[in-house]
Regions:
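Short, glycine/acidic-enriched loop or turn micro-motifs at the edges of active sites
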Residues: 35-37, 158, 194
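A short alpha->loop->secondary-structure connector
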Residues: 141-150
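Short, motif-level signal for alpha-helix interfacial/capping segments enriched in acidic residues
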Residues: 4-16, 132-135, 166-171
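Active-site flanking residues adjacent to catalytic metal/cofactor-binding acidic residues
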Residues: 31, 154, 190
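Conserved non-catalytic scaffold segment of RNase H-like nuclease domains
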Residues: 13-29, 33-133, 148, 175-180
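Acidic two-metal-ion nuclease catalytic site recognized across multiple nuclease folds
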Residues: 1-23, 176, 196-210
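Acidic, Mg2+-coordinating catalytic module of metal-dependent nucleases/exonucleases
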Residues: 120-134, 138-139, 169-210
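Short alpha-helix plus adjacent loop in nuclease-associated cores
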Residues: 153-168
């Protein structure tokens, strides 16, 4: 959820001939989280006093996996942080989410995770950056039972970094592969959809397989 740089778009024809192979055989979910952050927090690993990666937004799309990849359902909701209920100016500028937004429209982390696991309905969940580890840490920190303990998670950032030779955020990937920008970056649902567009593009081009 932190900013990254794109140094130029690359067409499919410019990528290596090999195909990535990580798609689940059946339907799956693509998900993204937005969590509290401050200037420099990522570099120092959220290690300053009072810095915690508290979930503020969950976004996800359910994907039908056939000859093409198609979105069949979506969710997006805000979560009220409790350790840092007042969001940093940095976070608000990055995401467009304000403290008033989460105070008025946010739900509890426990409720959000219950709704999220119901949405996934046993399907594997793909993330770009290991967001499951954020959920595990949040539940441990707040003494909550993790309802997604049995969920199959797959972090697809490593194969993308190996394929492109670059470290990028999920919101940067469409531009890298020459796809038009659609939606605000650092919005959990928009970033989930951005990642799905890239997956669908690569599958259609024969560069991505199960």
């Amino acid at each position: 959820m932190v900013t990254g740089n794109v140094t130029g778009a690359a067409s499919i024809s410019e990528r290596p001939a090999r195909a990535m192979s990580f798609l689940p055989a059946g339907d799956f979910v693509v998900a993204d989280l937005e969590y509290t952050t401050w200037p420099g927090a990522m570099v120092r690993g959220w290690s300053d006093p009072g810095e915690f990666r508290e979930i503020v937004q969950i976004g996800a799309v359910r994907v039908a996996h056939g000859d093409s990849l198609c979105e069949t359902d979506a969710l997006s909701f805000l979560v009220r942080p409790t350790l840092n209920p007042v969001l940093s100016d940095y976070f608000m500028a990055l995401t467009g989410i304000t403290s008033d937004d989460v105070a008025e429209h946010g739900t509890t982390l426990e409720s959000a995770l219950q709704d999220f696991v119901a949405f996934t309905d046993g399907l594997p969940v793909l993330t770009h950056g290991g967001d499951d580890r954020v959920i595990v840490a949040e539940c441990a920190r707040k003494s909550l039972t993790n309802p997604m303990d049995e969920t199959t998670w797959q972090d697809i950032r490593p194969p993308f970094e190996a394929y492109t030779g670059r470290k990028m955020m999920s919101s940067d990937l469409p531009a890298h592969f020459g796809l038009p920008d659609q939606g605000r970056s650092h919005d959990a649902l928009a970033d989930s959809r951005a990642l799905l567009r890239v997956l669908a593009h690569l599958q259609e081009a024969g560069k991505l397989a199960s």
